């Protein structure tokens, strides 16, 4: 029995320095966010990029940073399920739900089609399209966890997280003005904001800047998009296995049903049945947020800024096009439903 515990202790000892550094970066980012208003995810990423030397081979922190960027990330995604329940769907009505679901699916399909025009592969299309369509940085990290590894995996993930976070912040300021320009009601404004802005925090900020009804509706719509994370990640995983794309590219085939997806679905199911008390759900949400913040700090530390800048204008154009496509689609859908 003692022998079986030694590897676990060894893993903890090996991973702790890198995890501690990542947690410190995340805490610093949260402090700056609380005092200056910038998104914590963006700050954690930028601070992490400045500490890339800590992830170099041979450093004591490198193993823990790699562990945090992968395992802690998956824990954060799994715990998101505690915030999801089937009761959310009944509150919106079938028309709005159909619009939100269609927006997610069509944005991902648009990304796959548009990526060919800018010379980007299917991995990059799924990564950016899924992050724009679902829930920004959290979706990007979840999708990256099931995509086959390749030479530019970390660079593309950091670019995607950075881009969707910046675009979310811009949208938080711009989209409420567009909702007024389009003449949307408070409810429709909430559907528009929740259905188009990438990250949850910016959705909340944009929604409540208009009013309580808009803020509550926007948050609800956003959580419905978040609830699509597990099905979308599962579909990606199944498609990759079925087509043999991972083996063809020399990568490691992802599992049929990743453990963090099972965790997400299990928690969502328990919450839907009312088996998770509100206090526990709120606590799980906070743990999830911190796990993702620490993980994105680790991802930033692992990534070379110089290599990230090699991503090119085509990638920037693609993620902008995906963002515009989703906004136009939801706007058109609201006008048709209205």
From Swiss-Prot:
Keywords: Cell membrane, Membrane, Transmembrane, Transmembrane helix. The keyword Amino-acid biosynthesis does not apply. It is found in: Cell membrane. GO terms for cellular component: plasma membrane. It is a multi-pass membrane protein. The chain crosses the membrane at residues 36-55, 75-92, 96-118, 125-147, 162-184, 223-245, 255-277, 290-309, 314-336. Signal peptide: none annotated. Disulfide bonds: none annotated. Belongs to the UPF0324 family. This is UPF0324 membrane protein TauZ. The gene is tauZ.
